[in-house]
Design a protein with these regions (language model features):
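Conserved nucleotide-binding/hydrolysis micro-motifs of P-loop NTPases
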Residues: 78, 241-243, 413-414
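Conserved DEDDh/DEDDy metal-dependent 3′-5′ exonuclease domain
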Residues: 2-5, 14-140
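Helical catalytic core of nucleic-acid polymerases
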Residues: 88-146, 155-165, 207-208, 216-337
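Catalytic palm subdomain of template-directed nucleic-acid polymerases
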Residues: 121, 161-171, 288-289, 379-393
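Short glycine-rich phosphate-binding loop at a beta-alpha junction
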Residues: 69-82, 238, 290, 373, ...
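Acidic, glycine-rich two-metal-ion catalytic cores of nucleic acid-processing enzymes
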Residues: 2-4, 8, 16, 23-50, ...
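C-terminal polymerase-core module
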Residues: 287-294, 302-346, 382, 386-421
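RecB-family 4Fe-4S metal-dependent nuclease core
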Residues: 151, 155-156, 390
Length: 421
């Protein structure tokens, strides 16, 4: 192992044009969000050697001239790539695709923490570098890089940008409600953390005990999320009948303009719109009965489900429509026609959302307003008071493009959002 602990040595290393195959930043805090801590040191591996570049660890002198573009190539596997914003490949995604399970560094490196106090925020700066090295050198490489790994790496990097906005909270009540350690609440901001390492790619979102993706709607938890701006507001864009409309795109079915998809299907069911929602949910996720198969929309859905399943069984994989990701047969346990279709639907929803998030973040570049949360069929924006009308117009246009209507809700906090007529 080669230790680089001076700027002179680091510049010399850059000049050698190293071909780095793996990069693993170890952050000073094992618990804090990456946007709330610093890099302790960077572990690098080439084909014939490995290196540690020190920045904040107490075992060595410190460098401060990090230039990731001089170290990371498009083919470098980078752990936590979304927080370094490099052009490399997301190591965790590549690992998940190869082994079918997530790679969690703190669990992989569990042995380095034995005998140390877990409540010290900057613990990773204190555990001996050689102890770290003995673990990091065992991180497995993946050499078979599929084409879609890069597309997903780019999308996961987009999630990192979304996390970076932070979420302004009512500190006292947030700490009380979630038993949150204020040491991890810089200037009243909490951080989301998306976990996209799932079979369908759809991310969960949990950090330090807060489940952002499934925050309770009835116990006041959401009231703790507020705007960071004086006179600011929270705007949420909700997709209308999102899954039904995605399915319509998949099967080639057009819904009439001027009515919601649920209103459209209610006419065939002969029930109210509210009852229509429940029936559609039953048919889409529980299977179609003979009555449903007599409805034009579900006739197309039934044909599509059978076609997808037949291709899945023959090829041994499920290929997503947008990113062309291949999900192996064995990753879908108990693969029935309905289950395979549901996996495909969830994967497509996720890929559409990744593209939409990228467009929204690009649109918000240079603006004060921030996108702060994504929950499958809803996007939450923290809006500066001078940008409200612009957000309502421009972001609504982006989200609805492609035939996906949204409704906008506004509130002073995440709990009191009301529909904007």
């Amino acid at each position: 192992m080669n230790l680089i602990e001076t700027n002179k040595a680091l510049l010399s290393f850059y000049a050698s044009n190293p071909k780095v195959v793996l990069a693993v930043p170890v952050w000073s805090s094992p618990k804090a969000h990456e946007y709330d801590t610093s890099i302790s040191f960077l572990y690098l591996r080439t084909n014939d050697s490995d290196y540690i570049i020190n920045f904040n660890h107490i075992d060595a002198q410190r460098c401060n001239l990090i230039k990731f573009d001089r170290l990371i190539s498009p083919n470098t596997l980078v752990f936590g790539n979304r927080y370094l914003d490099t052009k490399g490949l997301d190591y965790e995604w590549v690992y998940f695709e190869e082994y079918g399970k997530p790679f969690i560094l703190n669990e992989f490196a569990e042995e380095v923490y034995r005998g140390y106090r877990s409540d010290f925020k900057y613990l990773n700066d204190c555990i001996p570098l050689m102890r770290w090295y003995e673990v990091l050198k065992r991180i497995p490489l993946v050499s078979d890089i599929k084409e879609w790994y890069r597309v997903y790496s780019d999308s996961i990097r987009t999630l990192g940008r979304l996390e970076g906005a932070g979420v302004k909270v009512d500190e006292e009540n947030f700490i009380d409600r979630f038993h949150f350690n204020n040491e991890y609440l810089p200037k009243g901001f909490a951080y989301t953390k998306y976990n996209p390492y799932t079979v369908t790619g759809r991310p969960s979102n949990r950090h330090l005990g807060v489940n952002w993706a499934a925050m309770n709607k009835s116990d006041g938890s959401r009231a703790n999320i507020v705007s960071r701006f004086k006179g600011g507001t929270l705007l949420q864009f909700d997709y209308e009948s999102y899954h039904i409309r995605i399915i319509g795109k998949m099967v080639g079915y057009r819904f009439a303009e001027g009515e919601t998809a649920h209103e459209h299907l209610a006419k065939y069911y002969g029930v109210s719109t509210e009852e229509s929602k429940a029936l559609s949910f039953k048919y889409l996720y529980g299977g179609l009965d003979e009555f449903a198969k007599g409805i034009p929309f579900f006739q197309k859905v039934d044909e599509y489900i059978q076609s997808v399943y037949q291709k899945f069984v023959i090829s041994g994989r499920l290929t997503t429509p947008l990113y062309k990701r291949e999900i192996p047969f064995q990753r879908i346990e108990g693969a029935t026609e309905q289950k395979v279709f549901n996996y495909l639907l969830q994967a497509l929803e996720t890929e559409i959302n990744y593209k939409k998030i990228e467009e929204v973040l690009k649109c918000l570049d240079g603006r004060r307003s921030k996108m702060i949360l994504y929950t499958y069929d809803a996007f939450l924006i923290d809006v500066h008071p001078t940008e409200k009308e612009w957000v309502l117009k421009d972001l609504k246009f982006i989200l609805e493009r492609g035939g996906f209507p949204v409704r906008a809700y506004e509130g002073s906090n995440y709990d009191n959002l009301e529909l904007i007529p």
